[in-house]
Amino acid sequence: MNILQLGAPSAVLPSTATVQVGEGNDIRKGQAGDVAMGAAFNYLFKKEFPGSQITFMNCRKKFSKNDIDVINQYDVLIVSGGGLFLYDTFENNESDWQWGISEELLEQISIPIIVYAVGYNKFRGQRNFNSRFDKTVKVLVEKSLFFSVRNSGSGDAIKKHIPEYLHEKINLNFCPTMLLNEKYKLKHQTTNSVGFVLAGDRLSNRHKNIKQFSGEIKKFTDYLSKIGKKTILINHEHDTWSQNQIQFDDIIDLFQADARKTYETYSNMDTVVCDRGHAQMIPFSLGCKILTPISHNKLKWFLDDIQLNEFGIEENDSELGNKLIKQYMLQQKLDWENIYTDRMNKIKQLYLKNMNFIKAQLSDLNLN
């Protein structure tokens, strides 16, 4: 089966690029979460569709009729991964999200479409999507063999842009980064380390009062130091800004690192304080406790889906530091291993259910 994977690469690719996907050829390089996501999709394709030829196409371009002709030469199109429903990473007049395609051209795609674990990533305070978003997403949902989002909140948000009769086509399907440790088989280690991933991009969108936020995080790191914990600042990309305001015991740079290093790093963390999506998902998938200063709705949505929303605190809460301390202390009293095992089993069961559905649909079309 010839699969075309459409997505947004972290690496700088020409907008016209199509790249063969395989070992040693990862089109996502740079931001640690994106690298992990690329590796997770590569692993997923190899495991579930052995022998298939996978080609990656950059979605961040203005698509033409020629591009549709190229797409239609493949057996199936998989729109995959990440927060594609966001306009500011590739502003365009075609769709108002990261795939620069008009509704008219979407209609001309003749091969089966699978939308796999995408996210509604509009930041708080950003303008609403325009009518082109509504039109293209409606067509995409209509045409999709399977349409899935990586958290329920994204699904609820998408439903506001499409007719009610399409709502039943929206499925929850967690990001495949949550299952990539199947490949690495890393065991979570008991340590006294607390990692901090404090996103450094779009600071004005994330924080109403950056000085207050830094002060509250410092209150928490001071507490951790007093009780003998090692605080480690972790950089996914642009995430070292806080070291000027907060003293950490160590810094680990995962920018440009391969996915295995990211997973190895988190397997040696007891707790991760995170306001990036993959800095929630990957550590949790390895057994880490997670605490989240919520600066984006997707962070809350993930916690809602794993039924741990008490461990998310709004970033502009004037008592953020004290609440982090309180929730950290609470986590130490919980049977976290049991919580982790229960949630991961549910995530795996949902993955299997969705993948079995996808394979059945493809089989009905004589694609396998």
Question: Where are these predicted regions, by residue range?
Answer:
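Active-site anion-handling motifs in enzyme catalytic cores
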Residues: 1-368
